[in-house]
C-alpha cells in the first residue's frame, strides 16, 4: 500500500505527463473495455483461443480509435486540470471512431478475415465502456489531485463578480497548486442570484449584512474579477467594509484587456494599491490618430525625466517615432531614461540630453541640430511651497523656459507645441500656479500672432493641456503618506476639508497625446478629472490598506499659497465639448502678443533682482485674478 501511495504522489506531483503516456493509458482502457464487454456478452465463457482472436479484433478497432484520438487530440491536455471541454473531446473522438468501426465492421467480415464477429450492439457497448473508462480516468485523477494537494492552508477567499469573469477566475485559483486561495463563495450585487450555489459555493449579496458574513466565514482575501475592476473602484461602501475588516484585496490588470475568450488560468493577481481604490472611469483614446501623427516623426519632450515626461516618453515610443529628443536637467533620472530606451526600445534613435530649458543658446543648438517636428513641453518646477519661497526661479524656469522653447519652436518650424499645464493655473493663489497661467497666456497669444501673420501658410500650432494632481508623481502626497505610515506616523494632512482631483499618470498622458493630436492651435484643453477626493479620506484608506495600527492623522494647517480645493476653470471661463468625452475646451479671453511679451520681458528682467515682493507684484499685474492665500504676498492684494 505504501508503494501505491508513493507512486500516486509521484504521478500527481509531476508537472504534466507526456502525451505518449496519456495515449498509452487510453489505449489500455480501450483494450480492457473490449475484453470486459466480450466477457459480459458471453457470460464469462471465454476460452484461451478466443482471447488471442479477440485481442486481434480489439487491436483492429483500436486503430480506428487512434484516428479519433489524433483528430480531437484527446491526449494533449493536462489530466489533473481536465474540464468539460476535455471530456467533450473524448466523447467526440469515440463517436467518430465508432462510426468508422461500424463501417469497417461490414467490410472486414465481408472479406471473411480472421476476426471475432461482433454484433453492432456489442461494438457500441465496447465503445461506450471505453468512453466511460477514459472519462473516469480523467475525473478520478483530477479529484485525487484536488484532494491530495488542496490544503486548508490556503487563504479563505471570496470572489467579487459572478457573470463577468468571476467563474473563470474561480477556476483559475482552483487549478493553482499549491493552493494559495481557498474559494469560499462569491460576492454579487444582483439579488436574483443571492443565495444560489455556484461551483459548490454560495453567492452572497453586497448588503448591510455582508460584514457579518465575512466575519463568520473567516474571509481573509477578496479577488476582484477582471471585468469588475471599474465597478469595484466606485463601490466605496464595499471597499470600506473590506478595509475595516482587514481583508486583503487583489485585482488583475485592466478590464479593457480582457474578453470572453481569455484564458483565465493565466490571471496575474496583485494586491491592490491606493490607486486601485480611487473612483475613476476607464479612459480610451484614438490610438490610430495618435500613431498617424507621431509615427516616423522627430519628437522633443522637455522634462523627460520627470513623472509626466517619462511616461510621455514611454507612450510616444510605442508609436515608433523616427527620433526622440529628450531634455532634462536632472542628470541621474535622465540617465535612467537613457537606460530604459536602450533596453526597451533599442530600435528608436533616442537622444537623452542634459540641459536647462532656460538656457537659450543651448536650446537653440539642440533645435538647430535635431529639428523636431513636435514638442511636448512638460518641464516645470511644480512644488507649491518651494516656488512660494523662490519666485525668481519659478519665473526663470517656468516662464522664461517656456518662452525659450515656444520661440524656438516657431523659429525652427515645429508643427505643433503641446504644453502641460495645471489646474493650479486657474484663479491662482500661489506663485507656481500663477507662473503656469502666464505660460498659458504667452502660448495662446503667440499662437494667435503667428497664425494672423501666416497668410494661410503652415505655422506652429500651440496647444495647452490643463489637469490636476496625478497619482504617484514626484509631487504627490502619496509617497509622503507611505513614508509616514512606515515610520509609524503621524500622517500629516494640512486641513480636514482639503480636496483634490486625482488621475493616474498614464491616463493623463493619454489625454495629453489625444489633445495634442486633435488640437488645431490656441486651445486650452481641460481634462475631466472625475470625482474629487478628500485628502483626509485618502490618508485614512492608506493607513487601513497598510494594515498598520494606532497611526494618527495630524492636521497641520494650509501651507502658503495652498487652496482647499482646485479648479480647472476660472470664474470667467466656460467650456465647450471636444472630440473626447473626457476633454473640454476652455473659452478664455484673447491677449495681444506684443503687450504680453512686453510684460513677460519686464518680469524676467525683474526676476534677476531676486526681489520676491517686486517679482510677485509684477506677476499679479499680469494675472489680476492671482490672489495669494495664506502667504506673505497677501499684503500685495490690498494695494
Predicted regions and their residues:
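Proline-aspartate-enriched helix->loop->beta-strand connector
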Residues: 214, 218-220, 321-322, 367-376, ...
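Signature of alpha-helical transmembrane segments in polytopic membrane proteins
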Residues: 1-153, 181, 194-197, 220, ...
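N-terminal Rossmann NAD(P)H-binding glycine-rich loop of SDR-like oxidoreductase domains
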Residues: 299-317
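Conserved Rossmann-fold cofactor-binding substructure of NAD(P)-dependent oxidoreductases
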Residues: 354-374
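Flexible, Lys/Arg-rich cytosolic regulatory linkers and terminal tails that connect or flank
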Residues: 3-4, 233-298, 410
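Strand-loop microenvironment adjacent to phosphate/nucleotide-handling motifs in alpha/beta enzyme folds
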Residues: 246, 289-293, 445-639
Amino acid at each position: 500500500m505504501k508503494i501505491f501511495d508513493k507512486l500516486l504522489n509521484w504521478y500527481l506531483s509531476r508537472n504534466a505527463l507526456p502525451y505518449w503516456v496519456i495515449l498509452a493509458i487510453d489505449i489500455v482502457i480501450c483494450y480492457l473495455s473490449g475484453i470486459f464487454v466480450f466477457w459480459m456478452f458471453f457470460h464469462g465463457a471465454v476460452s484461451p483461443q478466443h482471447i488471442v482472436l479477440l485481442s486481434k479484433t480489439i487491436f483492429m478497432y483500436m486503430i480506428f480509435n487512434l484516428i479519433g484520438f489524433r483528430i480531437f487530440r484527446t491526449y494533449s491536455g493536462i489530466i489533473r486540470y481536465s474540464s468539460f471541454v476535455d471530456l467533450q473531446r473524448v466523447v467526440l473522438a469515440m463517436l467518430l471512431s465508432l462510426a468508422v468501426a461500424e463501417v469497417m465492421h461490414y467490410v472486414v467480415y465481408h472479406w471473411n478475415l480472421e476476426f471475432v464477429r461482433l454484433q453492432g450492439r456489442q461494438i457500441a457497448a465496447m465503445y461506450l465502456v471505453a468512453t466511460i473508462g477514459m472519462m473516469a480516468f480523467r475525473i478520478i485523477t483530477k479529484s485525487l489531485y484536488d484532494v491530495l494537494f488542496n490544503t486548508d492552508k490556503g487563504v479563505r477567499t471570496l470572489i467579487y463578480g459572478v457573470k463577468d469573469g468571476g467563474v473563470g477566475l474561480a477556476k483559475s485559483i482552483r487549478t493553482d497548486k499549491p493552493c494559495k486561495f481557498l474559494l469560499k463563495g462569491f460576492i454579487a450585487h444582483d439579488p436574483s442570484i443571492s443565495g444560489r450555489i455556484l461551483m459548490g459555493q454560495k453567492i452572497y449579496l453586497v448588503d448591510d449584512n455582508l460584514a457579518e458574513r465575512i466575519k463568520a466565514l473567516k474571509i481573509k482575501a477578496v479577488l476582484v474579477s477582471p471585468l469588475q475592476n471599474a465597478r469595484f473602484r466606485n463601490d466605496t461602501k464595499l471597499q470600506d467594509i473590506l478595509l475595516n475588516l482587514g481583508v486583503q484585496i487583489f485585482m488583475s490588470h485592466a478590464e479593457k484587456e480582457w474578453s470572453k475568450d481569455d484564458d483565465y488560468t493565466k490571471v496575474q493577481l496583485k494586491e491592490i494599491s491606493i490607486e486601485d481604490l480611487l473612483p475613476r472611469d476607464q479612459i480610451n483614446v484614438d490610438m490610430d490618430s495618435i500613431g498617424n501623427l507621431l509615427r516616423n516623426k522627430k519628437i522633443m519632450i522637455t522634462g523627460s525625466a520627470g513623472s509626466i515626461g517619462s511616461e510621455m516618453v514611454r507612450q510616444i515610443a510605442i508609436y515608433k517615432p523616427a527620433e526622440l529628443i529628450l531634455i532634462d536637467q536632472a542628470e541621474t533620472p535622465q540617465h535612467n531614461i537613457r537606460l530604459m530606451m536602450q533596453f526597451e526600445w533599442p530600435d528608436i534613435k533616442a537622444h537623452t540630453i542634459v540641459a536647462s530649458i532656460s538656457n537659450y543658446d543651448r536650446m537653440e543648438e539642440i533645435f538647430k541640430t535635431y529639428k523636431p517636428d513636435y514638442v511636448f513641453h512638460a518641464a516645470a518646477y511644480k512644488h507649491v511651497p518651494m516656488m512660494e519661497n523662490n519666485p525668481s526661479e519659478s519665473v526663470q524656469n517656468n516662464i522664461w523656459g517656456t518662452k525659450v522653447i515656444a520661440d524656438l519652436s516657431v523659429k525652427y518650424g515645429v508643427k505643433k507645441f503641446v504644453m502641460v499645464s495645471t489646474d493650479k493655473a486657474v484663479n491662482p493663489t500661489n506663485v507656481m500656479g500663477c507662473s503656469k497661467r502666464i505660460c498659458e497666456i504667452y502660448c495662446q497669444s503667440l499662437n494667435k500672432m503667428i497664425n494672423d501673420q501666416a497668410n494661410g501658410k503652415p505655422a506652429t500650432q500651440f496647444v495647452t493641456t490643463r489637469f490636476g494632481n496625478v497619482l504617484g508623481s514626484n509631487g504627490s502626497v502619496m509617497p509622503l503618506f507611505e513614508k509616514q505610515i512606515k515610520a509609524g506616523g503621524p500622517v500629516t494632512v494640512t486641513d480636514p476639508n482639503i480636496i483634490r482631483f486625482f488621475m493616474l499618470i498614464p491616463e493623463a498622458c493619454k489625454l495629453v497625446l489625444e489633445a495634442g493630436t486633435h488640437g488645431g492651435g490656441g486651445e486650452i484643453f481641460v481634462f475631466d478629472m472625475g470625482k474629487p477626493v478628500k485628502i483626509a479620506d485618502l490618508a485614512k484608506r492608506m493607513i487601513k490598506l497598510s494594515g498598520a495600527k494606532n497611526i494618527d492623522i495630524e492636521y497641520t494647517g494650509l501651507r502658503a499659497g495652498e487652496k482647499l480645493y482646485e479648479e480647472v476653470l476660472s470664474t470667467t471661463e466656460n467650456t465647450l465639448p471636444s472630440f473626447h468625452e473626457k476633454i473640454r475646451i476652455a473659452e478664455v479671453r484673447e491677449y495681444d502678443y506684443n503687450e504680453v511679451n512686453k510684460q513677460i520681458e519686464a518680469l524676467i528682467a525683474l526676476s534677476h533682482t531676486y526681489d520676491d515682493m517686486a517679482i510677485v507684484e509684477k506677476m499679479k499685474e499680469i494675472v489680476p485674478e492671482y490672489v495669494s492665500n495664506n502667504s506673505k504676498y497677501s499684503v500685495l492684494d490690498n494695494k
